[in-house]
A protein has these predicted regions:
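Juxtamembrane/disordered regions of integral membrane proteins
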Residues: 1-142
Length: 142
């Protein structure tokens, strides 16, 4: 159940942050790129979100199988967030002719920071709700 709830939280938080950035706040920023599809294929992005969320909740469980803390949730989320956002923030403007490299970096890093901070809080909180009381309870939960 904790993995399902964590994955659901990641989907909601990702759509809230990235969707708001792409479709409301930074529309001109993304339209200026000139290579985006007129109609994005949301299924492919959704698959990526599911894979990323599954990996993060699984890693937190491996790190703290008897129950995590909000602090550990933040560490896992921010670690993966830094890993994932480093490509989009730095490698993408190196390859693509973005109008302003520093604007690109600022937008991508700030939105990613918001996304992964909120998810880290949610991830740690959700996992903390499922703390095993004894080793036998832990074995039953697995």
């Amino acid at each position: 159940m904790k993995h399902f709830l964590s994955l659901l939280a990641f989907v909601i938080i990702t759509f809230a942050t990235q969707g708001t950035s792409h479709m409301l706040i930074n529309v001109d920023h993304y339209e200026a790129l000139g290579f985006l599809r007129p109609e994005p294929i949301f299924l492919l992005g959704f698959i990526a979100i599911l894979i990323q969320g599954t990996i993060m909740t699984g890693c937190l469980h491996l790190l703290a199988p008897e129950g995590a803390t909000i602090r550990l949730g933040l560490i896992v989320s921010l670690g993966f967030g830094l890993f994932l956002s480093s490509y989009i923030s730095f490698a993408s403007p190196a390859k693509y002719d973005v109008p302003s490299i520093w604007e690109w970096v600022a937008v991508e890093l700030s939105v990613s920071a918001i996304q992964f901070i909120f998810f880290g809080l949610a991830l740690g909180f959700i996992h903390s709700l499922f703390k095993a009381k004894t080793k036998s309870e832990l074995k039953q939960a697995l």
